[in-house]
From Swiss-Prot:
Gene: glaH
Metal-binding listed as a keyword: yes
Entry keywords, A to Z: Dioxygenase, Iron, Metal-binding, Oxidoreductase
Subunit structure: Homotetramer.
Name assigned to this protein: Glutarate 2-hydroxylase
UniProt organism field: Klebsiella pneumoniae (strain 342)
InterPro entries, per database record: AlphaKG_dependent_hydroxylases, GlaH, TauD-like_sf
Amino acid sequence: MNALTAVKPTPAPLAQPYPGFSIAPSAQSPRLLELTFSAETTTQFLQQVAQWPVQALEYKSFLRFQVGKILDDLCGNQLQPLLIKTLLDRAEGALLINGEGIDNVSQAEEMVKLATAVAHLIGRSNFDAMSGQYYARFVVKNVDNSDSYLRQPHRVMELHNDGTYVEEQTDYVLMMKIDEQNMQGGNSLLLHLDDWEHLDEFFRDPLARRPMRWAAPPSKNVSKDVFHPVFDVDSLGRPVMRYIDQFVQPKDFEEGTWLSRLSDALETSKNILSIPVPVGKFLLINNLFWLHGRDRFTPHPDLRRELMRQRGYFAYSTNHYQTHQ
């Protein structure tokens, strides 16, 4: 997929109502569901959690679960089971989530609270060494001199999984749009592992199971290398992946050329989804069988995008990596 390309949308299906929210397959793919909290639910949630600033959620980790309970109660306790079912379902495993009425950078704290509540209904977000918190906020601008592609606006950030260079289990990734100014392009890119045309070819290769070294640049604040293969299997023997092209360190010619072929095969897939994510919305995906990236932006001197991410483990699943826990 080339820069600024988008999957042609199909007519949006009717949303299925639940207490406090609705859900429907997205226009881009039936694997990606769109979940929308009603304005009433969003308002009531923010009122009930107003007593806790985000700093309280940072300092007292149990409050992250409490705000999740408040949100689930407002949704008739039907939200949590639906989130768990969707995220663990191999046929789906991805959500685009929106709280009606949260759509401006002035509501950044409210955005963090809502995303935190959702994430802690399915598990717990890991410590993010880059920010020193359970979440990270970062800004993309027109000019960037950082040491990874995370903030570089004028190139595609290739498809990858999160958590490749840390020891913590990374089952889910949450990516929220907090602000956007003078932006064109930069859609989120998603690829479901089972839709990748070359999965069988690379999964069956002997190098797929060879432990490789993964090392992060200084900005990630992680100094210890980790070792694991690119592919593994879940508890049912299905392929799962832990891969990012920037941080894998091949030890020899064989590994290096194999990784180069794998990267090309991912980036040229015809099944990559291009997903616009408006301010206030967030993607929540199963990191074991979804890869994600970002298309490039059109240059603008005042370009600005602020994102928030959380990544963590499922508390209700044993479908982790089986051979390299």
